[in-house]
Amino acid sequence: MFTYQKIIQLALLLSGVCGALASIDTDSHLSPKVLEKLRPTENLAYEDDSLDDDTWRSKRWEFDYQYSGISTFAHLPHVRCLVEQSEDFDIAIIGVPFDTAVSHRPGARFGPKGIRSASSRQMAIRGFNPSLNVNPYESWAKILDCGDIPVSSYDNQLAVRQMTEGYIDLLSRKATASPASNNLKTAGLAKDGIFHPRLITLGGDHSIGLASLRALGHFYGNVSVIHFDSHLDTWNPKRYYPSYWHSDRADFTHGTMFWMASKEGLINNGTSIHAGLRTRLSGTDYYDYEEDNRVGFTFIEAQEIDEIGVNGIVERIKQVVGDTLVYLSIDIDVVDPGLAPGTGTPETGGWTTREMKSILRKLDGHLNLVGAEVVEVSPPYDDRAESTSLAASDFIFEILSSMVKHPLYDVKK
């Protein structure tokens, strides 16, 4: 039942609404009277009287807080680059939500979402990297979050084709930044004579690296691989499983992709390196290490950091890769599972996140990076603090910083 008092209150409310509607001009712009009420008071320092009303009303909503906005990596602009074919960029973040080539725990298909969510505290307004003296989000580079490559979870052969074609599509574009008139650097010049953009992949299980290397091979030929991992990932599939259960489709796993890439001639023989190894080998001898050497890798075991330190690790990597084009592959399980539990094949005795960040920073300026990936983040197995996703997002920040600070050609800034 409406009482007399409630009817009076309703009438007053309707009167106020009608008055507000009447104050709006026919061209949908707010009237000066309403604008005056919306504008900040004169004693607020952030008001810019030089801006017209439309600009002012738009500009005051530009800023996102760390916890607001849709989930893109570091609040970067999101473009579905595979759909928007005319979109160019210098560096793109691309997710590959795939985990059906794992040997143990799944969940890495949720890695791209987890890493993006964990990156929410990275913002242009507070993105300066004091160790590398650069803010990658306020620089010459046009950086986008290009979303994910849609991949099948039912057919791994189809999924690899989707990944490869997606990578080639993105890499085929011309980088946004023009070369400087006095450009003397040609390291990043592709076989077609064009400077192409660079991609950083959010995995996904580690098998996605094969598709990335196939795409890079299309533009650059073979490249060197710096591979941070607790496992070799150069397992010979013919030895790994009994021959009577063998199938060609089963050859492709997150532990065989670098072996396959080497056999396809995608990896430089002798200038690629694993770092952080600490797993068991197959059989009763060192066959896995011998096979790894045959496919062109050398390696650093995790415990060597106790003897030669971070600087020693960095020097070994630099000596191996030299000035070749480099693909940087970081399996999050290189980090000790006590610090990064959210992964599919954890191994105890790993490096700390501080050691990994220090290695990445000390490699800055010494690598011709053509691409990178951070893989094997499995949010379902992460802790309540989302430590694994956070570590992955921080590693990507270091990679982005290095890519921006050291472009593969002299850019016009």
Curated annotation (Swiss-Prot):
Disulfide bonds: none annotated. GO terms for molecular function: agmatinase activity; metal ion binding. It catalyses: agmatine + H2O = urea + putrescine. GO terms for cellular component: endoplasmic reticulum; fungal-type vacuole. Its EC number is 3.5.3.11. The keyword Membrane does not apply. Its cofactor is Mn(2+). The keyword Manganese applies. Residues 1-22 form the signal peptide. Mn(2+) 1 binds at H206, D229, D233, D331. PROSITE patterns: ARGINASE_1, ARGINASE_2. Mn(2+) 2 binds at D229, H231, D331, D333. Keywords: Hydrolase, Manganese, Metal-binding, Signal. It comes from the Eukaryota. Belongs to the arginase family. This is Putative agmatinase 2. It comes from Schizosaccharomyces pombe (strain 972 / ATCC 24843) (Fission yeast).
